[in-house]
Amino acid sequence: MKIKPVVIAANSSLLCFFSTSYCLAQSTPSEFAQMSLQELFNQSIYDTEIQQGQASPWTLNYQYKTAKFEGYLDGTKSLSFNDVKGPPSNGSGKTFPVVPTTITQTAHIYSLGYQFNDQWQGHLSVPYIKQSTDHLSLVPGYSTFTIKTDGIGDAVMSASYALNSESWLLSLGISLPTGSIDEKGDTPRGPGNQQVPYTMQLGSGTYDFPVELSYQNSSAPNLSLKASATIRTGTNDRDYRLGNNYSLSGRYKVDLSSRLKGYVGLAGQYSDSIHGQDDSLLAGDPATLYPAS
């Protein structure tokens, strides 16, 4: 069963560029706020000039992302909230006593880059994340409720190397666990604030390693390909680890005229399941994972 998303992404540059994307289910805030290493290499919204008309090696990048998830799918079939909300379904996964209805994610991603030479470039990226999730519930006193979290996410340090006249680009990085995994909110599990689900935490809590290999030819028509992965290590202080992420994408662009360009692209992404569990999210007798996790 998947939540249906409505996703909008905007990249700010000297000019403003808007793009739309589609995904099948909500990602965790730390996954949502990740910026493509190729985007970091290519983007520059602030590029100071030094003497002799040469560009400064320093760049300052900003990216704004927002996503909204609403509704449920069972395969390709749309489900109403009444179809999903109900007594625990004894493991069948069809009904839940607590149901997220609308999930809104926003990320402001700030990146500082330095061009060492024609082949090497380094970046430091820090996101600020906000998330709000509306719920319906069968629990008395919690027929409707909202959980909100916001703060700094996981910082990423990365290096990019141009392999062949910038046609091939290899990028490696390390994601630092600077985002909180201890966010709390008022949930039906009990009075007061409790630990909120994995999908509301701002960071992964582990040291992770993003890697990306991309290709882009400089001649027309233009073809670009990208393969990337985020490899996660160990377990965090809450005894779990987010799953590894893998993605493949390609884009074919052609100049239809001097002012008109067209392109077609295809992308796929796969995420492993979460390893381990945060026992503070367990509720009920026998104890089961909090449904909104």
For the regions a protein language model found, what residue spans apply to each?
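Outer-membrane beta-barrel biogenesis signature
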Residues: A25-P88, S167, T178-D182, Y198
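Extracytoplasmic loops and strand-loop junctions of Gram-negative outer membrane beta-barrel proteins
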Residues: Q43-I45, P88-F96, V139-S143, N193-T199, ...
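Residues on the lipid-exposed face of transmembrane beta-strands in outer-membrane beta-barrel proteins
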Residues: I50, Y62, Y110-Y114, L124, ...
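Repeated loop/turn-to-beta-strand initiation elements of outer-membrane beta-barrel proteins
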Residues: W58, Q119-L124, E166-L169, P221-L225, ...
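Outer membrane beta-barrel transmembrane domains
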Residues: L73-T95, N236-S293
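Surface-exposed loop and membrane-interface regions of Gram-negative outer-membrane beta-barrel proteins
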Residues: D83-Q105, F116-V156
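Short sequence motifs at beta-strands and strand-loop junctions characteristic
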Residues: F96-T106, K148-G153, Q201-D208, L242-N244, ...
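Outer-membrane pore/translocation modules
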Residues: P127-R241
